[in-house]
Amino acid sequence: EITGKAVLHSVVQTEPIGPKKMCDLLVIAPCTGNTLAKLSLGITDTAVTMAAKSHLRILRPVLLCVATNDALGASAQNIGRLLNTKNIYFVPLKQDDCIKKPNSLVADFDKLEDCVTLALQGKQHQPIFL
C-alpha cells in the first residue's frame, strides 16, 4: 500500500530488478542469518536473494539490516565475507542482549535513513559495530 505497487514474492518476479533498473537501492530489513548465508555464498533460491543478486549485477547498492541470534557464531563468517563485497553496505550492528543472547546482533534501525543516504553515495556508515 505504501508504494502502490504489487509485492514481488517469487524468484521469477525479482530477477528483472537489476536489468530493468527497478530501484536505486535495495534494502533487506530484517536480514536474517539464513539470508546472510545465502547472500555470502551466492545462493539465489528466494525472492530476497534473487533481488539482491539481480541488483548487484548492475553494480547498485544493497543495504543489509541484520537481525540474527547467531551473528557472533555461525553467521560471523558470512558477515565477514559480505563486509568485503562491493556494493554491500550494513546498517550498524549492536548486541541486543549480551547476557541472554551472547551471539545475537541486530541493526540499529534508527540509523536506517542515514545509511540509505550514505549507501546511495557509495559510503559505509561508520562505525559498523556499536
Question: What annotation goes with each model-predicted range?
Answer:
Residues 1-62, 67-130:
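A cross-family phosphate/adenosyl-ligand binding-site feature
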